[in-house]
């Protein structure tokens, strides 16, 4: 199986790894942080991150999700930072798309 490096483990990196896996390639995701999701983590996980307390997405939960893995139905229309972080972490654990994640510390 061929491997492809994906730089950063935010939403775009996760989407890239998923798309690569769907094409039969193994994605190796590299990020400088020790958590998945990029800026979409709560203040405890990423205290120096760009997201602030109370921040929400500017897109509804119907527009900022993978078409085959929607947000929980009980989530508010515009997810908070911790909700997006949980969604992205859940996505990575449930998809099991053959991705390796390495934090570059």
Report each predicted region and the residues it spans.
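Rossmann-like flavin
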Residues: 19, 85-98
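Glycine-rich active-site loop/strand segments that organize a redox cofactor
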Residues: 25, 32-90
